[in-house]
């Protein structure tokens, strides 16, 4: 600063503890700096541009009514009306900060990295150390693989290394950030293009906003010990303590959460979360819903759904899992510990700790305090198909650098291996208790005879569908001249994929690959967060290659055909079965959808009118059945899949004629 500039600043009511420590950019002008106090090392950029605000008002960049202590201000910022002060921050360019109580960093901070979140078990023992690069899969392993202490120690070490590397006594506020009418911000790192409006308190965290996926923090929000990832919205009185919020999440309407992890595309409104592991697409909208000590993904919680992790004995020590795609109805209740199979529906109050992990696509219904299980029935539900279609469409992530690798497939080696086990379990129950039993018992749940018989059939249809799909995909677009060529094409490209598969919160992969990664972490070969995420990406991108290896092995088990000796006739047999399964399943889905257009569904329509008016009113609001887009999609699906199967059968017939 020149003597002249210092005099001009003093005349504009500016003060400094030591003017010698105030440095400015080349083209700095004192014109837009009023009522400002400087202490410590302060570095100012230029003030050339204006901000256009809602209502048509223009504000020139500059400093007005603010105290700065050890602050670097980028070019073209507007900072005014800071009630207390801004201390120890680097502020980017084109940032607008107005009417804020205080923004400071006190001592060295890790900005939320390394915070221990007591997920699943409230009393501890499954802590996940959150960090900027945390993926659902990494957190899954850290929370659940406690039987491998060496792995856990290594993963903590890797996170600590990252946290310490990014620790600092100076916070940063990015470029093009807007902070308005906000209370206290302490030890928070704020990324580019973030908008913070009317927020109450932010303490010890990172807001990883960027230009392609800005973060919005809204009115009345309170966050302590947190990390918020790109593209997320935390609004309207949400309260978070010790939480990780993944990419493109929406939390608002007074949602309160503690010790919880929310991964990509989660939504939480009105209700409460405590120690939950919310994998991708966990959605809860209702005031009366408590999710506690559970693991969820692709999950919809009905109003009044809750769980208990406390039996008034040794404290809140229990936990449970709803595998991917599970849903709860209104007023459902589960007493943990329990495990609910994938894509199942939970209805009523369940207190018997059942484990239906190997009976996916089921209904769990309570009658007189007894859990009744209807296996496989959700496979023909129109809701399940609608869910599978809506999730990819609702992926709100705009950041090209995705943290979670999400597999949306309804039928995958993960769910189909469970169907194989489920089918075997049901057949064994039938064998053990006799075919004429009215009710069978399984893991403290009851299964009615008719439900058991249908369950076996549903699972068989789904297995036909999956294996047939895999064969068709594998033989797609090639003109074969002989059975040898068919066999050569059917041979898997890799041995990886055989054996068990796992769903590590959204990512479906062979257990052998997950174990290989874990061994790599234990041995120190994989020793950075980005290397762990790269391994998950590799598993995800090779999914279809690994899937075929698994399906190839199952052909013999299910069809009794040795794949090494497979002929065109065998392929035709598999495809015929597949066509039957696909069309059969689509017909069931079609019939299920039809129920939504029955006379019972018209109850309450056509108020004050006759039956004709009721039907007309219904049609105006809901449309008619045949032109419903979903129904049309099902019919189209039947058509397309039949043609696909016929095309392969045609190619195979040419081979068998040779």
For every predicted segment, state its role.
Residues 10-16, 24-47, 51-63, 72, ...:
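Glycine-rich hexapeptide-repeat left-handed beta-helix
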Residues 56-64, 159-180:
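Right-handed parallel beta-helix
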Residues 84-85, 89-91, 95-96, 101-111, ...:
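Long, charge-dense tracts
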Residues 100, 106, 367-658:
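Long, compositionally biased intrinsically disordered regions
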């Amino acid at each position: 600063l020149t003597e002249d500039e210092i005099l001009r600043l003093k005349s504009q009511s500016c003060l400094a503890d030591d003017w010698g420590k105030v440095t400015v950019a080349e083209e700095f002008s004192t014109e837009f700096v009023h009522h400002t106090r400087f202490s410590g090392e302060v570095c100012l950029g230029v003030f050339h541009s204006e901000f256009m605000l809602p209502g048509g008002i223009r504000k020139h960049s500059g400093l007005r009514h603010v105290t700065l202590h050890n602050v670097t201000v980028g070019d073209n910022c507007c900072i005014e009306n800071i009630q207390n002060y801004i201390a120890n921050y680097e502020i980017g360019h084109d940032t607008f900060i107005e009417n804020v109580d205080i923004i400071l960093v006190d001592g060295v901070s890790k900005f939320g990295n390394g915070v221990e979140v007591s997920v699943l078990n409230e009393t501890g023992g499954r802590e996940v150390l959150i960090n900027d690069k945390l993926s659902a899969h990494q957190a899954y392993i850290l929370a659940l693989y406690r039987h491998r202490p060496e792995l856990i120690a290594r993963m903590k070490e890797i996170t600590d290394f990252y946290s310490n590397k990014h620790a600092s006594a100076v916070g940063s506020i990015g470029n093009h950030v807007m902070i308005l009418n906000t209370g206290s911000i302490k030890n928070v790192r704020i990324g580019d293009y973030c908008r913070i409006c009317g927020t109450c308190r932010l303490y010890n965290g990172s807001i990883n906003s960027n230009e392609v996926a800005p973060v919005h923090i809204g009115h009345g929000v309170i966050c302590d010990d947190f990390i918020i990832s790109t593209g997320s919205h935390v609004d309207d009185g949400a309260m978070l303590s010790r939480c990780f919020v993944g990419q493109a999440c929406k939390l608002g309407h007074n949602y309160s959460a503690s010790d919880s992890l929310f991964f990509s595309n989660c939504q939480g409104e009105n209700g409460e979360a405590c120690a939950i592991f919310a994998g991708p697409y966990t959605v809860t909208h209702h005031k009366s819903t408590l999710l506690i000590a559970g693991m969820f993904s692709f999950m919809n919680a009905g109003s009044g759904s809750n769980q208990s992790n406390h039996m008034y004995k040794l404290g809140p020590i229990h936990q449970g899992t709803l595998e991917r795609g599970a849903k709860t109805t209104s007023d459902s209740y589960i007493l943990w510990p329990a495990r609910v199979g994938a894509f199942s529906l939970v209805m009523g109050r369940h207190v018997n700790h059942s484990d239906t992990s190997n009976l996916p696509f089921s209904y769990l219904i309570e009658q007189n305090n007894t859990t009744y299980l209807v296996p496989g029935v959700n496979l023909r539900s129109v809701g399940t198909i609608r869910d599978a279609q809506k999730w990819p469409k609702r992926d709100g992530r705009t950041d090209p650098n995705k943290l979670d690798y999400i597999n949306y497939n309804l039928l995958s080696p993960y769910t189909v291996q469970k169907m194989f086990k489920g089918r075997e379990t049901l057949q064994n129950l039938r064998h053990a208790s006799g075919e004429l039993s009215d009710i069978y018992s399984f893991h403290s749940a009851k299964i009615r005879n008719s439900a058991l018989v249908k369950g076996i059939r549903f699972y068989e249809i789904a297995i036909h569908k999956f294996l047939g799909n895999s064969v068709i995909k594998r033989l797609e677009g090639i003109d074969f001249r002989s059975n040898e060529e068919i066999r050569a094409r059917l041979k898997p490209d890799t041995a990886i994929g055989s054996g068990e598969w796992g769903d590590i919160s959204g990512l479906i992969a062979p257990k052998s690959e997950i174990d290989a990664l874990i061994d790599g972490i234990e041995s120190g070969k994989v020793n950075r967060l980005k290397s762990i995420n790269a391994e998950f990406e590799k598993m995800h991108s090779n999914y279809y290659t690994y899937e075929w290896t698994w399906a190839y092995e199952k052909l013999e088990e299910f069809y009794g055909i040795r794949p090494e000796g497979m002929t065109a006739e065998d392929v035709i047999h598999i495809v015929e079965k597949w066509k039957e399964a696909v069309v059969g399943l689509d017909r069931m889905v079609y019939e299920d959808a039809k129920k939504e257009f029955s006379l019972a569904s018209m109850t309450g329509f056509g108020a004050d009118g006759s039956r004709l008016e009721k039907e007309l009113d219904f049609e105006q609001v809901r449309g008619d059945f045949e032109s419903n887009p979903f129904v049309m999609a099902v019919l189209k699906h039947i058509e397309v899949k039949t043609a696909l199967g016929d095309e392969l059968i045609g190619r195979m017939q040419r081979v068998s004629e040779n």
